[in-house]
UniProtKB/Swiss-Prot annotation:
UniProt keyword annotations, A-Z: Disulfide bond, Electron transport, Redox-active center, Transport
Keyword Cell wall biogenesis/degradation: no
UniProt-listed InterPro entries: Thioredoxin, Thioredoxin-like_sf, Thioredoxin_CS, Thioredoxin_domain
Disulfide bonds: C33-C36
A single MF term (Gene Ontology): protein-disulfide reductase activity
Species of the source: Streptomyces clavuligerus
GO cellular component: cytosol
Protein purpose: Component of the thioredoxin-thioredoxin reductase system. Participates in various redox reactions through the reversible oxidation of its active center dithiol to a disulfide and catalyzes dithiol-disulfide exchange reactions.
Location of the Thioredoxin domain: 2-107
Protein name: Thioredoxin
Family from the record: Belongs to the thioredoxin family.
Length: 107
């Protein structure tokens, strides 16, 4: 059974993501985005084996301020935040293996 991803909003982003003690992967997505739906099962599967990183979702249509603040121009965009800063960005639908790979991912 896949894990459930927590939804964050413009109002909860700072507390849930920027002030988190562990790294947080934020999935910037939208309902109408086919590739976003394509990667959702991979992200949910990763949460089952997690513990080292938290994975959350932010709907850009409902929460445009945070997406704009971090320059999200296309979706899906996955940003990893650590200590309040973006430490890794993945743009586009990537296979699960690429999502698990440490270090920067080519765009």
């Amino acid at each position: 059974m896949a894990g459930v991803l927590k939804n964050v909003t413009d109002d909860t982003f700072e507390a849930d993501v920027l002030k988190s003690e562990k790294p947080v992967l934020v999935d910037f997505w939208a309902e109408w985005c086919g590739p976003c739906r394509q990667i959702a099962p991979s992200l949910e599967a990763i949460t089952e084996h997690g513990g080292q990183i938290e994975i959350v979702k932010l709907n850009i249509d409902q929460n445009p301020a945070t997406a704009a603040k971090y320059g999200v121009m296309s979706i899906p965009t996955l940003n990893v935040y650590q200590g309040g800063e973006v430490v890794k960005t993945i743009v586009g639908a990537k296979p699960k293996a690429a999502l698990l790979r440490p270090g920067p991912v080519p765009r």
